[in-house]
Each structure stands twice: as structure tokens, then as C-alpha cells.
Amino acid sequence: MRINPTTSGPGVSTLEKKNLGRIAQIIGPVLDVAFPPGKMPNIYNALVVKGRDTVGQQINVTCEVQQLLGNNRVRAVAMSATDGLMRGMEVIDTGAPLSVPVGGATLGRIFNVLGEPVDNLGPVDTRTTSPIHRSAPAFIQLDTKLSIFETGIKVVDLLAPYRRGGKIGLFGGAGVGKTVLIMELINNIAKAHGGVSVFGGVGERTREGNDLYMEMKESGVINEQNIAESKVALVHGQMNEPPGARMRVGLTALTMAEYFRDVNEQDVLLFIDNIFRFVQAGSEVSALLGRMPSAVGYQPTLSTEMGSLQERITSTKEGSITSIQAVYVPADDLTDPAPATTFAHLDATTVLSRGLAAKGIYPAVDPLDSTSTMLQPRIVGEEHYETAQRVKQTSQRYKELQDIIAILGLDELSEEDRLTVARARKIERFLSQPFFVAEVFTGSPGKYVGLTETIRGFQLILSGELDGLPEQAFYLVGNIDEATAKAMNLEVESNLKK
């Protein structure tokens, strides 16, 4: 059943007309609520607790029904802190799932899981709202066009190209650059693609959310003078929020993106940082609801929860949602159930490597681990495919030779292998790139490199035309012409020192 967005008059509150219950038990963020016989709320209905605590402070807590316990009781998970709640307090059944504002009114604003603005810029037009729980589009509505989504990041466009309307995962452990890469993608896509983006901050650092907001204002993605001209809506449920909020904030962001796709018929970008926190919050809620844990302590409903979110992120005949999701990998273990379940839904995986980050190569994208279903000659063309395969072969050969080099040194290799190693080291450095969003840290201006320029650069390295250039000339540059110019500068500098 697909529930369409509803339109209602502004400020109409129907809470007073609904069923009333009372709090029977409070266990952290979980509430048990008793209702009169025959007046039980449905699963996923929103319940509202209003009143005052012992100090007289106003309380307004929204919960979501998760279980019907019998004996006219339901168990609900709170979307905000339950401080100050007491047994016996009145609970209102709203009679419907959580609904959030959608449409143009959301652009340039920051929302919480309930769709309430948290940026102190005044109220949002809530005449058009949509429930966060909806079924995925029917099979017949889906669209299956295959086209590449250019990002301007060399390593991504060459080795693991993104699909327009596809799902992309950024995999990496702690501190290897997932959020910076997401911020660069938002920046590049807003400039080159000009579409609408929705950013879902799921259980990540509040500081990063604030940095992102400030950078969006600086780069013009959020237009402070005319908010309606902004290109992005932000939804945040950060690390300090209760698990209920972190579990549902992804659905809030997705609901806003679906409206742009289905009603406005736009191509939308949905960024989720971090999808692992969605699973983690689901695991916390599952334990609070008393379910038996499954593998590695995760919830038994892990695949179902992930599927219900991911199946809604898709392209229909009206428009597309291209989704880029950061995936934290616990202890760098890609076989952990959370990242492993996410892998199954993705069209492209960009794996970030701690080894490359340690070498100072950013973006630290692993050229051998990263994959894409789009890297086929019939989709990207023979030239792109051949270049990508040769880059991977050269990198793979270098990886195989590293043990020999570590023990015996470069001199023990054959002439051919030494040439392969020299080219692989140039390729490794040329896969790095200065980012626009990292200008403040690095001091070097960001670079957007088109796909044709990227392919030309790697072809020149592989052909041997640039064998005479020093490998440091290829580090943190844009296209290949910058590398040759940098090599000339290095030569001039070394001559001056002599």
C-alpha cells in the first residue's frame, strides 16, 4: 500500500480528538502504555506525551508503537529523551504514523527526526506532509536506464563509476575519510549536476553536521539570502539522540527525497552518513524490546530493516534517487553482519583503505577492493574499460611484488617488474587528488577532473610516455598536464639547489 502525501490546513491540531492512554512503565527510551479496551493504536502509530515534569517544565515527547503486548498495553520507543516522564501521565494516540514536511519548504533547512526545524530560522510550511513509513514502488514503476554519474573524482570515475539512480556505499573504518569524501561529492554534484540533495545525518558527530552546514552556506549550496533557492535539505539525528530517533531519521530523509522524485519528478541525491548507525540503533531498540539477538549481537530482523529502507531508494519513471551511503566498518572487518548486509543492496562500493591513508594518499580509495556493476565495456565503452583494467592489473602486480621488495629490495626484480613498480607508484600517487572541501587543511585548491581527462592521464602513464618524470610530480594534482608542469617545477628547484 502506497500512502500519498497529505495536504492539510496549517496549524490544525487533531490530537485532542484521539484515543487517550496512560504510561504504565518506563525503561529508558521504551514506554509501556495502557489504553482502554478496544482503543488500541496500530503498530507504527505516533503517540504523544504532553504534560509537565516535577519542576514544571513543559514535556512533549513523541513515541512510535513497536509492539502490542496484550492486556491492552503497547510498547513504544521514544524519539527524544524521556527525562521527566512519570507513570500515569496521559498519552495521546495520533492515529497515524509519524509525518514530516516535504517539498520545496524543506530546502535550506535542518530538521530532526520528527520533521521539526532545528536551525532557529522560524517555522516551516507544514501544509504538505508525508508519512515516513511507506511501501517501496511497485515493480512496474521502476526504471532501469544505465548511465554513468560523473563525480569529478579520478579514482571513482575510472575504477568504480557510479550509476545514475544507483546505490553507492563508502566503506571504511574510523578516520579514513568517509565524511570528507561525502562532503566533496555533495560539493561537486551541487556544482556540476545542479539537482536537489537530501542529507541524512544518522548517528554521527554533531560537530561534523555543523561543519557541513557552514560549508554549504559558504559554497552557496544553501542560499542564506533566499532560502528557497537552496539545493539541499538536511535531516539530523546525531550520536547524542536516543536510539529511536537514530533508527528513524534515515526514513525521514528518504521520505523528503521520495517527494522530490514522485511529485516534483526530479533527480534527487540522497546522502546517508552513516548507514551503520541505522543498523546500530536498530540493534539497541531490538534489545530494549526484548528480542533475542542474532549473529554478533545484531538484531534478528537486520536484513528486513535494511531491505525496507534500501528498497525505497530507487529510480521510477517519474525521477531517480541516487544514494551515496557512508558505511562504517567495525574494526575494519568487512565480514561483520552490518557492512555485509549493506553490500547486497549496492551498485558500486568505494572501499577506503587505512594503508593508503597512512601513506598520505587522499582520497584513500582502494583501487583493488572498490567495485562497480557499471564497469562493463558495453556501458562505459572499450577505452574506459581497458584503461581501468590495465590500472588494476598494474596495481595488483605491484601488490604481489611488495613482499619481495621488502625482503630483497628493488634491485633483485627483473627489468620488466621494475618498470611495472615505477608505473604503479605513479598511478598510486595520481589516484590522489586535492579536494575543494579540504582546501582549509591542505592549502592547495580543489580540482574537478572530467572523465575524458582522467582516462587520458592514466593512458599516458601506462604507455610509458611519462616514465622519465619523478613520482612525486603525480601526487595531489588534478589532470595529467598539472603533473608534467609540477615535474618541470621540481626539476627547476633541484637545479637551483645544485
UniProtKB/Swiss-Prot annotation:
The domain of life is Eukaryota
Q: Name one GO biological process term.
A: proton motive force-driven mitochondrial ATP synthesis
* Catalysis performed (reactions): ATP + H2O + 4 H(+)(in) = ADP + phosphate + 5 H(+)(out)
Alphabetical list of InterPro entries matching this protein: AAA+_ATPase (IPR003593), ATP-synt_VA_C (IPR055190), ATP_synth_F1_bsu (IPR005722), ATPase_a/bsu_AS (IPR020003), ATPase_alpha/beta_chains (IPR050053), ATPase_F1/V1/A1_a/bsu_N (IPR004100), ATPase_F1/V1/A1_a/bsu_N_sf (IPR036121), ATPase_F1/V1/A1_a/bsu_nucl-bd (IPR000194)
Q: Which keywords belong to this entry?
A: ATP synthesis, ATP-binding, CF(1), Chloroplast, Hydrogen ion transport, Ion transport, Membrane, Nucleotide-binding, Plastid, Thylakoid, Translocase, Transport
How is this protein organized at the quaternary level? F-type ATPases have 2 components, CF(1) - the catalytic core - and CF(0) - the membrane proton channel. CF(1) has five subunits: alpha(3), beta(3), gamma(1), delta(1), epsilon(1). CF(0) has four main subunits: a(1), b(1), b'(1) and c(9-12).
This chain's protein is named ATP synthase subunit beta, chloroplastic
- Provide the species name: Cinnamomum camphora
Gene assigned in the entry: atpB
